[in-house]
Amino acid sequence: MEEFTLDRNSNVGNLIALAVLNKFDELARHGKPIIRANGVREWTTLAGVVIQKKMENEFICVCLATGVKCTPAGIIKNEQLGSVLHDCHAEILALRCFNRLLLEHCILIKESKKDTWLLEVADNGKFTLNSNLLIHLYVSECPCGDASMELLASRLENNKPWNLTVDSEKLMRGRADFGLLGIVRTKPGRPDAPVSWSKSCTDKLAAKQYLSILNSQTSLICEPIYLSCVVLYKKVIVKSAIDRAFGPFGRCAPLAEFGEKDNPYYFHPFTVLETDENFLYSRPLNQAEKTATSTNVLIWIGDKMQCTQVIHNGIKAGTKAKDVEKSQTLICRKSMMNLLHQLSQSLTNEKNYYEWKKLNIKRCQQKQILRNILKNWIPNGGNEFQWI
């Protein structure tokens, strides 16, 4: 098992962060936070996937996203399922963007019969990450959920002592009962927001240490790809919380017992690095400053795509949800399924998305192992739709 460390000395964290921050600065203003007419400054979270070329020690941002919103499946109309993005938190969107890029590279390899700088064809016929590459994730805020419980409590005006209970049999809202640690939480965290079964970013990132960062589409055609490092701004890190949420001796420790020779999935805890570099549009640490969350989401996918989209309420900005096809983003489930269909019709014969996901038996089995260990992981709704 790879040792988990919180490296406070290495400059790698700054190099990864700067790769994302510099790329964000290069993008056009549209979709970025603004200062509103009443003088209130908007804030958001930025996340980006950075590829490190080991031999050259080069760090390349290949995709990024901003966002802090989540749309519960229950308020999305049936005809819009698969077209609307549910989870618009930056780190989740950035990983969706990376999966879109992987699909594009798979198609390129199929058409050209040649490996790309990102992917190679393995002996078993699946695509695999180039052995010279490492994958990192930068996030400007501490991921919502268990990793940020102590940080959230420290920002409260009434910072009274709270009971440090380690387990619970309940599925908790993101900001409920700070004293309950090491448990699965949902987003949105606010008690006044509509209920969602979407898991916190902490839980989703923890899950990816076992299931890999591949999604339902790419996991069918690619060998698992794992994050090497997650980089966070140093002032949002509470080491004990990070260790508990992600570390090999925290709540994910039992996952180390799984993984066999014929099982491509195994527990791969990422290293958490800190950075001195702060994102210009981050939520201010000074609670006295009046701010508002940005309602826009911005995604950018680089490399061979070089494409930017602004997203509002889970669909392309400037479109209406009733215009189902026109409103679809590059990374919604229907878009990803159509791209996979372009790559392999034999893998996409089942048109019901829920039934199609169940056909990936190996991944479903590994998901159940993960849910049994993390506990209280109730599957999301919103999968009952025809993707084509």
UniProtKB/Swiss-Prot annotation:
Protein family according to the UniProt entry: Belongs to the ADAT1 family.
Keyword Nucleus: yes
Catalytic reaction(s) noted: adenosine(37) in tRNA(Ala) + H2O + H(+) = inosine(37) in tRNA(Ala) + NH4(+)
GO molecular function: metal ion binding; RNA binding; tRNA-specific adenosine-37 deaminase activity
SMART domains: ADEAMc
Domain spans labelled A to I editase: 63-388
EC class: hydrolase
Function of the molecule: Deaminates adenosine-37 to inosine in tRNA-Ala.
Chain sites annotated for binding 1D-myo-inositol hexakisphosphate: 96, 204, 357, 363
Cofactor(s) needed by this chain: 1D-myo-inositol hexakisphosphate; Zn(2+)
Protein's name according to its UniProt entry: tRNA-specific adenosine deaminase 1
Catalytic-site annotation from UniProt: 91 (proton donor)
Record GO biological process: tRNA modification; tRNA wobble adenosine to inosine editing
Catalytic activity, EC: 3.5.4.34
Residues annotated as binding Zn(2+): 89, 144, 201
Principal subcellular localization: cytoplasm
Record keyword Cytoplasm present: yes
Cofactor note: Binds 1 myo-inositol hexakisphosphate (IP6) per subunit.
Keywords of this entry: Cytoplasm, Hydrolase, Metal-binding, Nucleus, tRNA processing, Zinc
Highest taxon listed in the record's lineage: Eukaryota
Record's subcellular location: Cytoplasm; Nucleus
